[in-house]
Amino acid sequence: MSWICKTLLVCLSFNPVMDYTNNDEFIDNVRACALHLNSMHAESDRVPINLIVAQAIHESNWGKSRFAVEGNNLLGIRTFDPADEQLKPLNNPDVSWGLRIFETKCESISYYIDLLNHNHHYYKFRSERITQHFSDEIDLEKLAMTLAIYAEDIYYTQKIIRTINELEAYDRD
C-alpha cells in the first residue's frame, strides 16, 4: 500500500474535530491527533510529538492563521501542483506555489509525518532519527536542527528548539 493511501486510510479512520479556544487546547488537540497517527507507524518511523506541536505552533500561529482556519493546514505545507486545492499568500498571490488545503487539520499532520518519512529533502531528519532510535537516545534539538530546509527563516530551527524546550517545561508543571 502506498504511503498516500495509508495517509488517507488513517485520516478516514480518525477524524477528530480540532476544537480549541486557547493555546493549551491547541496543544492538546495537536497532540491527540499526532499520538494517534504515530501509533499507525513503526516506532522507528514516528515523529516526536513535541516536534510536531512546536512546528504547528509556528507554522499556524497556534491554529489561528488564515491557512489553518481556511485550509486546515497547521504545518505550512506547500504545493507546487496547480491541480491541488491551495491558498495563495494574500500579499503575493502570483507565486508559483500555494499552501495545500486539507479536509481536516489532523489530515495536515498526517501529511507532515509522511512528508518527513518519505520526501528526499528530509533524509537528514530520517538519518538522525534512526541513529537516535538505535541508541535509545531521543534528542529533539538534534532532530530539529535537521529541519532547517523546512522554512525560509534562517532562525527557524532555533525557534522550534526554544518552543520544544517550553513545551517540555510545560509538561513538567
Q: Each predicted region: which residue ranges?
A:
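Catalytic cores of secreted/periplasmic lytic hydrolases that degrade extracellular macromolecules
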Residues: 1, 5-53, 58-173
